């Protein structure tokens, strides 16, 4: 039967396991890989279930995918001389309530500003004239 415990069973049997998304929305759904990994950590605490340790779950979304596609010597972990994209979180990256604080891609800091963050800043504490005309009173 297909259960979430299967990935824990495969890991226990010595299989290199990785968690990833395979579809046309990879960029938008990348966060789901972290959520699945976090779920597997929680599953390990359920009696009778087989999940992953935190370290194994994190490796399943970082170094193991790189190893599986033959790029483990170049990417997937932070080592001198390797290419790397780095994300700094405000908490546990496998926890849904954690948020990204900083991102570097190929060593270049990335802006985290989006349309949503600009709107939040604009309307959280609106200045004179910031609200659309419909909101004038």
Describe the residue ranges of each PLM region.
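C-terminal recognition in membrane/secretory proteostasis and scaffolding
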Residues: 93, 130-137
């Amino acid at each position: 039967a297909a259960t979430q415990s299967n990935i824990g069973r495969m890991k226990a049997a010595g299989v290199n396991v990785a968690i990833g998304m395979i579809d046309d929305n990879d960029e938008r759904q990348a966060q789901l890989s972290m959520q699945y990994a976090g779920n597997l950590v929680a599953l390990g605490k359920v009696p009778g279930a087989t999940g992953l340790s935190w370290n194994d779950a994190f490796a399943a979304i970082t170094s193991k995918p790189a190893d599986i596609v033959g790029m483990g010597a170049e990417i997937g972990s932070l080592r001198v001389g390797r290419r790397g994209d780095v994300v700094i979180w405000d908490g546990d990256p496998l926890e849904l309530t954690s948020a990204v604080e900083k991102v570097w891609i190929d060593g270049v800091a990335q802006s985290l500003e989006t349309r949503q963050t600009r709107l939040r800043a604009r309307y959280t504490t609106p200045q004179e004239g910031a609200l659309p005309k419909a909101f004038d009173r």
